[in-house]
Amino acid sequence: MGGILQKSRFVIHLDNGLFNEAVLFDRTNLLIDFPLGRCDTVIDFGQINGVVYTSEFKNEREVEFSPLKNQEKQELLNLFTNQSDETQQKSLVESLFQLAGKRAFYPIDDNDVRKYFRRTVEDMTDAQRKHCFEHIDQYYKVIKKKIDCLAGNYAEKEFFRQREKDALMMQAMYSFKTSIAPTELATSLGKSLYEREGKISDFETMMLRKILEDNGVNLRWWHRNDSKKGFCINSFINHFPDFVLLTEQGTVVALETKGEQLDGAGSKDRIRAGKDWEKAANALNDGRKYRYMMAFNQERLEGAYDVAAMLDLLRSL
């Protein structure tokens, strides 16, 4: 079974003077020169409110929060308010960095992250610093989202810049195993690649049944792709399609099925990355055709499919 199908992924070629070697491309390569220090600190903290917590740093990666009583809250606020502006800023920066932990934004350097926290805090008014102190965990989440967004935008631009320069190439780098042993099993359905496939959700089962029960779809097999160790589209984001399908005509389909609540910005990124993978894989001219599809029960995003459109396309493959 291991020789049934190989799937293509992006690689970079390294030349050490003796021979040229293809190395699997890693998204972190895109962020090595990410200039976080030149990025804006325009962040909307307007939605933050709620209970004040005290935090206990158990280790580098784990923080425990406990709600404060009114008296404790007031005592801490008084201590913070009576500090100088510079001391307040240092305190907030240190708390934010402790919440992040070391190498939280790898490969972005920790010093650059700390400096970004400082610039963000320095932009705050007295009232904003006090509010940040009261809701430090929520502020961290908002700042983290901002950094992730900045890094994501940079990674996408850098990825396509390298694609234009042919610095990234497509090559068969993933093969299916001869057998799998899922810890949780899916409902037994026909035409699965393996005797038993890994667990799938009720929504995924419903979408898969629609495909299998459609008389016009000629499927050779389907496989539930493992979300951690399976086939990954290694683009400006790394993501694992829910299913890999092979049609009788030899078309390989990377299929993602999305519930209606999962149609945010992340899905848009996946569609762009998936369509680029499709284009690059087909350019190999290896005798197969490749398709990337994201399907909703009802179409919600540009570039995605509803059930009817998904089935209509699969019938033609």
Residue ranges and their predicted role:
Residues 1-240, 245-254, 262, 266-272, ...:
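Catalytic cores and motor modules of nucleic-acid processing enzymes
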Residues 259:
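Conserved protein-kinase N-lobe ATP-binding Lys motif
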